[in-house]
Amino acid sequence: MPLITLDSLSLSFSDKPILNEVSSTILKGDKIALIGRNGEGKSTFMRILAGTIEPDDGKLKIKNGVTISYLEQTPPENNDKNLFDIVAEGLGEIGGILTKYQHLIKQEKLDEAGKYQQKIDQLDGWQYLHKIEAILNRFTLNGDTTLATLSGGWRRRVMLARALIQEPDVLLLDEPTNHMDITAILDLERMLKEYHGTLILISHDRSFVAGIVNKVFDLDRGNLSVFECGYKDYVKRKDEQLHAEELANARFDKKLAQE
């Protein structure tokens, strides 16, 4: 059964069609590149999948229990939270309890910290503390650093860590390599290759995309074409498709001129 089903989704902005009765399925293990020209509505499509905006028509069907994590294109704004707290937010309630416990320990409020320690014991929460520490290390992040002190590229690393710690069934990434240096990009590529969930990715870095995806969604003037192949094969098939369209248009123009 598909994790996500798109059933005749339609959306327009100011009479411009973004999605025109789009139907498709997203399966477990799919690693999908969402391709299209600038302004085609790729980020809007991603937000529909994330549930942050609604289509005008059609249905987005998500299998019961499926979790989705979404990394937007814009880095987070300045705030004074430390990186441990931000990553822990991805764990929901237990993340908040661990954050409060850590702050109380640092403030040496041991009696109050003991109450939170009991909650953590009851929820078997220490494993999540280890998960937070492990993913901070994986992204070379210091949990005590505040977000406001970081550049755009490092902020994206923080938000990626928060998205991945949830171990979502579906991970939506909109231009994840923006502001990153080559070392960080290569490390992220390795990480996403190892990721066992379903991935939907927007990126202008074609080399990065080619190393990861096994399927392509091509968004063109509101229409979605699905290519069941990697990025390099998609490029070949797309070129062949465009060439065939050019020949067909030329034949039509020639016939029209003769009439």
PLM regions: where:
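Short cytosolic helices in intracellular loops of multi-pass membrane proteins
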Residues: 250-259
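ABC ATP-binding cassette signature C-motif
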Residues: 1-251
